[in-house]
């Protein structure tokens, strides 16, 4: 998956959270954002994953513009926010099936089983998300972020 970020600026009133940020990531590269609190790392991730619009600039994910083709981009990008919004009344497997249907995942039952296994949720899969520890909830969030990959 390639990502092209071109002169992204994000304004909150007169406050610049991002100021003409540009970079490119080639398919297969692994990168991380490092910086102090308030540097704009989370803001940039929200823009890349179509959860927040930029004030100025463009971003393309796999050649798709995040503003003009946001639904297509969302189907390609898995995003685990810091405060993971989960349906606490749903069971783990039920939630992953729900997310998988949203992304039109093929062989959904097999994919849910795979996600449960690789994220270490096997013994928790039949519990309600609200019954899980914070660590297991993060694992559920990770599973939902990568289920469509």
Report residues per predicted region.
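ABC transporter nucleotide-binding domains
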Residues: 3, 10-149
């Amino acid at each position: 998956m390639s990502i092209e970020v071109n002169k992204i600026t994000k304004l909150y009133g007169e406050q610049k959270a991002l100021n003409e940020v540009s970079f490119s990531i080639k398919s297969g590269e692994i990168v991380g954002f490092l910086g102090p609190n308030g540097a704009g790392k989370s803001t940039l991730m929200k823009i890349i994953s179509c959860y927040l619009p930029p004030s100025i600039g463009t971003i393309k994910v796999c050649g798709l513009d995040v503003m003009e083709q946001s639904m297509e981009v969302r189907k390609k990008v898995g995003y685990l926010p810091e405060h993971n919004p989960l349906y606490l009344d749903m069971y783990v497997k039920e939630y992953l099936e729900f997310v998988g249907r949203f992304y039109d995942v093929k062989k959904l039952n097999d994919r849910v089983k795979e996600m449960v296994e690789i994220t270490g949720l096997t013994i928790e899969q039949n519990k309600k998300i609200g019954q899980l520890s914070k660590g297991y909830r993060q694992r559920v969030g990770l599973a939902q972020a990568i289920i469509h990959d």
